[in-house]
Amino acid sequence: MLATLGTAFLAGNVAATPQAAAPAQPANPLQAQVGQLGVRKCANLFSALGQTVALGSDYSGQVQTEKAAPDAHGVVGVLGMTYKTAAYNSQAAGVVVATPVGTKCEGQLVRVAPFQRACKDVLALLPAGSTAAGALSGVPLYNLGGNQGQAMLVASGNACVVVTIARGADIG
């Protein structure tokens, strides 16, 4: 699976922790939510993508699917995340999607993380082996080292918004 998804500030912290003021949550709140919605087919992939997009953060999220037939439709989650690490101390947002395709499931995640520094300075946080992949309408695109997906670095004044994109699928 994807380890850091493109930013070094996520490396090394594998489990999300509940917020101090929040009531006790299961180890994986997204797994609990899809279970409550009756999602079984893509639940494991969705949960893994959710844990990956939120790696190293305190987070909460909302999950949606077709209530009448949850295993016949995609499941979508939106997450709000707070990071408190030496390299990154800010908020971020994520979107996770898992959809049945035949007998398996495929999914994607997107994370949006603003940095209060120039994009040229954020480049050093990309995983080793990351390479430039061109530009999309002037927005730099990078293939992340370790086959961890892609990242776009969007300049916003003196800040840089990192948009990380990755795919996942059931294996086996």
Where are these regions (language model features)?
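Sec/Tat signal peptide C-region and signal peptidase I cleavage site
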Residues: L10-Q19
